[in-house]
């Protein structure tokens, strides 16, 4: 057989083998075209799982009459025009293959109208040479695409379609993923004349959690931890479910987007799985909805026929950025201590004696630590990056990328005003800022400590209360507020409303944000220590306390809240006690020098030693 150029229809059918896998593939390509056209409303009508009819209607910018024939031609697009555009793709579509491929395996009709045109025009391609016919039509501004009898002329492909229910489930999943990517677009999905999904557009700054709950379910919403992580041109936003409460049903929720494009990327999944591995079983999977924003020049989306995968120019950097972003939220949720700096310090104040037993940042240590220590690194403060390398970091990557990677994982020292030179004080003893070494747990809530040969008992609930008070008390800046996924709405009396309004500035310093109307108050954000509390009990009690006060000082309110917080530990473990002491020593060093009543009690061993010697 001689070499010859294939007919246009046959060439398009071959290309359709990569682009059009099943009806859901058609829906994905056409809806993405609608989004690229600036549509704010998209209606999808499906019949018989998409095998009979797929109709996509949008209110986008439309297509001019002169461009309708080009729209159905191969490699014709308005989204890129040069090599530079290909290297920084910001649109969902860019190859110009979808419509030509779909029209070659179905009866496709394209109807469109722009705002400048007085009438709409309809185009369809038919025949061996795919000649396009254009005729007038009635249509509002926007575009409608009808795909009839998918694979009617390729029986082999049609034979491999699954049942109507299965094919529609694939379409439904595609729409769910797209709806999570574009909260600003109204999307309606119907099957066989019956409306199945209605996702209303969320206004800018609105409650995205309503759509999140409609798509992912209330179980995910209740366990979701919000992520907001940024470094340079990299931004990570979204939600990850608490791994301690992940169920097999929740594990099916794994939605990831890169610059608004839905992805199934192994690098991203590995980073998330690695961040959660200490809290997940071997057969468990994390649940997440995450949005990664990156400079378009740093990612290549033209590596997969269906554009399901991307390639990052600095894959290691992106991997560890995502890993650290997810890990930081999980660590904050567990309220673990800040990382210890590995650089030399003026005095060893920040490394108490018992931190060796506690397991300081062992990612930076070559030797293995005691198994009592947590496997994870302590969580960074908001916006910070730990300075230690990751446990699986590969030493052989390039120096230039290594420098960028090092900058990602380090936090610049805050700018401070120069101070006048002061006389150098003698360095403190290594254990002068430490309660001592934890020996064991006594009666489930007391830690037996040893320091300088002396034994003492420390009340862990009291230490936890002092820590909460320190975390809640504002310093030079207000306490960071954590937005609630589901705001808490409470009915209040006129007296309580007046007290709340008077205390609003003090509460704002504590990270408590609310809005009030005639008879209700809506709590929108709380500080981190309150995130896991039963707010439906705590907040009304706080409002009752404020109603009895005449002066509203943040410190007094923080003290009241700390005393009324429920402890997360019914029984304390050694690791939990060591972690708590590390936090208290860091945030409340004055308690080490002058322990308040009820916190620390020395144990006199001399009578026991004397009795032993007298035997």
Curated annotation (Swiss-Prot):
Protein name, per record: DNA mismatch repair protein MutL
Regions of compositional bias (Low complexity) in chain numbering: 364-391
NCBIfam families: mutl (TIGR00585), PRK00095.1-1 (NF000948)
SUPFAM superfamilies: ATPase domain of HSP90 chaperone/DNA topoisomerase II/histidine kinase (SSF55874), DNA mismatch repair protein MutL (SSF118116), Ribosomal protein S5 domain 2-like (SSF54211)
Family: Belongs to the DNA mismatch repair MutL/HexB family.
Source species, domain of life: Bacteria
HAMAP family per UniProt: DNA_mis_repair
GO CC terms of this entry: mismatch repair complex
GO molecular function terms noted in the UniProt entry: ATP binding; ATP hydrolysis activity; ATP-dependent DNA damage sensor activity; mismatched DNA binding
CDD domains noted in UniProt: HATPase_MutL-MLH-PMS-like (cd16926), MutL_Trans_MutL (cd03482)
Keywords for this protein: DNA damage, DNA repair
Source species: Escherichia coli (strain 55989 / EAEC)
Biological role stated in the UniProt entry: This protein is involved in the repair of mismatches in DNA. It is required for dam-dependent methyl-directed DNA mismatch repair. May act as a 'molecular matchmaker', a protein that promotes the formation of a stable complex between two or more DNA-binding proteins in an ATP-dependent manner without itself being part of a final effector complex.
Residue ranges that the Swiss-Prot or TrEMBL entry lists as coiled coil: none
